[in-house]
Amino acid sequence: MYIERFPKIEDKIEAGKVLVIYGARQVGKSSLVKNYIEKLKLNRSNEKQAFFNGEDVNVQAIFSSMNLKTLNEAVGDVSLVIIDEAQVVRNIGISLKLLVDTKPELKIIVTGSSSFELSGQIGEPLVGRMNIINLFPLWEKEVKDASLYDYITDLDFALRFGRYPAVFKEPVVEKKKEIVTNIVNGYLLRDILAFDRLKNSKLILDILKLLAYQIGNEVSIHEIATKLSIN
């Protein structure tokens, strides 16, 4: 079951600009893009598409090259380019600028799990050349439109487990816990630790736990530092 997300890609995408989709891992970026492509197929659009995975070393070599000939050979005659996990590609901003400036008819979608890394790379080169979608876990309007929505039950689950799409769609509580644990350990902490080369994963986890206990209250940095014996 696909849950309709807002804003929609079709409302933000335009030729001659890069559509940047920011969002944490597992929040639904890939599903949003796939749903957009499915809509194009249903509407019998003749747009030719090229999909690139930024974690592929060959893709990294192409889009970090800043070489217009290399970029044009990779893109070919397509009208829609999609680059997933673009934050791991060095010089991605400059390469995208070259494509936008030389192919004004081209539509480009890039997704990034690390807003810090991706915005740092594309911010200056793509000024005036990009639109942005910030994708978060499911929010009230999106959930209310889903067929299995029950306000009281969902509120309880939302407060306990959050609203990552995979968690929301899983009916079994124990499996919800497992999915949340996997997201925290497999993705969230990995991305946090990768930012600015942080290494102390236990300390980060302890800070997150203390922040969770203070939800709804004013956060005291001094109190957190005292409890964890850090400065």
Predicted regions and their residues:
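Pre-Walker A adenine-sensing motif
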Residues: 1-13
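Short regulatory helix/loop adjacent to the ATP-binding pocket of P-loop NTPases
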Residues: 116-132, 147-148
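Interdomain hinge/linker elements that couple catalytic modules in large macromolecular machines
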Residues: 136-231
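Hydrophobic anchor at the beta1->P-loop junction of P-loop NTPases
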Residues: 21
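Conserved lysine of the Walker
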Residues: 29
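Conserved catalytic/switch belt of AAA+ P-loop NTPases
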Residues: 93-116, 124-125
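Hydrophobic positions on the alpha1 helix immediately C-terminal to the Walker A/P-loop
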Residues: 32
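Short glycine-rich substrate-engagement loop in P-loop NTPases that contacts/grips substrate
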Residues: 48-80
